[in-house]
Structures are given as C-alpha cells and as structure tokens.
Amino acid sequence: MTEPDLSPAFVLHTRPYRETSQLVDLFVASMGKVSVVAKGSRSPRSSVKGLLQPFLPLHIHYGGKSSLKTLLQLEARSPQVALQGERLFSALYLNELLYYLLEPDTEYPGLFSGYFQTLLALADQQQLVSPLLRQFELLLLQQLGYGADFCYAADSCLPIDPACYYRYEPEAGFITTALRDHAFFSGREIIGIAEQAFSDEYILAAARRFSRQAFAALLGNRPLKSRELYSAFIARRSE
C-alpha cells in the first residue's frame, strides 16, 4: 500500500466541534485555505492533540468531497516557530489576514513560502517587526489580486511624480489630487513603498498607512482580534 502524499501546512484557526473533535482552518502549501474536521483531536488520548497549534510547521493528509474535509494524517515537520510579545501578536495578525481573506481551496503561488519565511524572520530578534509586516502585506495583496500599481497614476496613466500627491482608491489605484492630509500619499512615498525602502521611517510609515487603507476595504467591519490583544498587552505592560 502506497503512503499518501503529505502537504506542508500551518494552522490558522481552530474551534471545538462536538465532544472531542475540532474544526480546523489550515493554510496548505498547494491548496491555500482548507477547512477540516479533526476527529477526536480533543480526546485525552489523541495522538495529534498538541499538534494543532499555530506556527507549527505540519505535514498533513486529508480527504473528502465536501467543502469540509476530514483530517486523515498529521505530523510535525519541524519545531514550532518560537514567538513572544509583539512578535507573537504580529504573527497572529498575519493568521487573521489569511483566515479572513484567502479563498477556500485556492492555490496562491509563493504565499506559503513567504508566510513561513516571515514567521522565521519574526522569530529572529535581530530583525525589525514593522518592515517584515509591510513586506508580507504587500505580498498578500498582490497574491489576492489587489496589488496596487505603484508606478503609474490610475487617472492619467502618467508615471508617479515624486513631487505630486495622490489618494488611494482600492478598486482603481493612486489618483492625482491637489489635497494634502493624513489620508494622501506623496509620489515619493509611493515610489518608496514600491521599492520597499523600509529603512526610511518616512516610507515605512506611509506603507503602514497604505496597508491600513487597502485591508480596510477588504476586511470591511470585521475587527482583528490580534490588534485588540496587542493593545491589551501594551496596556498591561505599561501599568
């Protein structure tokens, strides 16, 4: 009997199901977001009880013809990525974006490896958190089909001018404007975001502002729990 092919995966979200099982949303390398039922995974003697955790690289096998698959095999392929404090909440933020925005059973080439590399980079205390988040956000937007054109203005098709100002319209792109306030971007900022020149704090702040606008349009009114948890963490630390 041949061994089943195992797919690399990460857990995005779990919730209890019936008495001893779980419903699990997975990020699978070859299939994007996949929802499975892990039968008996909450029972005391379950062999997979401690494996359905976020940030633990997994190999999985699942089956079924409905949108809810059945988890058939699960094993850890390397140790859990060690994350604490701000870095943990940042990784939870990435998981929420993937959970809410990925289409079920849809492959996103390059996104899985980008996610894994971002987790590893977040675990490296020598790397700054904010640039890593901005890089992944840009990758995710591009993979979702909402990547902005940072080279040309949507209204004129002219190259972005460092001396001009633009507003961002999620369905269109950057549109030239004469107004200037916190919601608008200079051409210099847009070019800097395109180049991912995030060692420049001015560009890094603009990239964060851009991501907030872009994801607000996609997430709608859905609140991100990771932001609430991080705010509570900061409040407790400052007491």
UniProtKB/Swiss-Prot annotation:
It holds the Pfam family RecO_N. Coiled coil: none annotated. SUPFAM superfamilies: ArfGap/RecO-like zinc finger (SSF57863), Nucleic acid-binding proteins (SSF50249). It comes from the Bacteria. Signal peptide: none annotated. GO terms for cellular component: bacterial nucleoid. One of its GO terms (biological process) is double-strand break repair. The keyword Transmembrane helix does not apply. Keywords: DNA damage, DNA recombination, DNA repair. Involved in DNA repair and RecF pathway recombination. NCBIfam families: reco. PANTHER family: DNA REPAIR PROTEIN RECO. Belongs to the RecO family. This is DNA repair protein RecO.
